[in-house]
Amino acid sequence: MLIQQLGRQDYVSVWQKMQDFTRQRGGAEDDQLWLVEHYPVYTQGQAGKAEHILNTGNIPVIQIDRGGQITYHGLGQAVIYPLLSLKAANIGIRRFVSLVEETTIALLQDYAVAAHARADAPGVYVADGRKIASLGFKVSRGCSYHGIAINVAMDLSPFLGINPCGLSGMKMAQLSEFVPEIDVDSVHKKWAELFSARWR
């Protein structure tokens, strides 16, 4: 599995590259993880409802093709896009989502942060119920794209402009609250290592 460090990128260009890559790719030999930070943007998934957009100010809202509702991306957030052949791995989407959540929980445990998944609302949550990681995927031709966003050290205030993932009143957390000297690159690297070991 090839790991690509993309640095800071605008959302739309990476989304278009994911779509192009998934259209043209082959089987497991083409599996990749893309690690990126995005400039501020709201993305509204296919199930997204306008009522969950409260006050987005000057930040753009983009309608996209992943599952789920609205979320926010900004600098200081570790975004990971697993571009994988689920078909070649003989794994269903539900097990794949669980694998992504389990990897993120293991990552947080490495930083001594207790976290859990919820059966009723995909993502990863810290002990007090706040959400620290959001996820959403699209599967095309048996291959996944889109991914997971882990709040590391960012301005969380734009989340107040939406009901994150369609959950009214959902409060957000970030890793820097628990680990002050944390950075996105470290989280990207550790997540990729943990996931690669699980995917083999």
Swiss-Prot record:
UniProt subcellular location: Cytoplasm
Any one cellular-component term (Gene Ontology): cytoplasm
Domain of life of the source: Bacteria
UniProtKB keywords: Acyltransferase, Cytoplasm, Transferase
All residue ranges annotated as the BPL/LPL catalytic domain in the record: 27-200
Biological or metabolic pathway of the protein: Protein modification; protein lipoylation via endogenous pathway; protein N(6)-(lipoyl)lysine from octanoyl-[acyl-carrier-protein]: step 1/2
Catalytic activity: octanoyl-[ACP] + L-lysyl-[protein] = N(6)-octanoyl-L-lysyl-[protein] + holo-[ACP] + H(+)
Site note Lowers pKa of active site Cys, residues: 131
One Pfam match: LplA-B_cat
EC annotation from Swiss-Prot or TrEMBL: 2.3.1.181
Top-level EC class: transferase
Example GO biological process: protein modification process
Residue numbers annotated as active site: 165 (acyl-thioester intermediate)
GO molecular function, one term: lipoyl(octanoyl) transferase activity
Function: Catalyzes the transfer of endogenously produced octanoic acid from octanoyl-acyl-carrier-protein onto the lipoyl domains of lipoate-dependent enzymes. Lipoyl-ACP can also act as a substrate although octanoyl-ACP is likely to be the physiological substrate.
Miscellaneous section: In the reaction, the free carboxyl group of octanoic acid is attached via an amide linkage to the epsilon-amino group of a specific lysine residue of lipoyl domains of lipoate-dependent enzymes.
UniProt record similarity statement: Belongs to the LipB family.
Protein name (Swiss-Prot/TrEMBL): Octanoyltransferase
Natural source organism: Dichelobacter nodosus (strain VCS1703A)
Gene: lipB
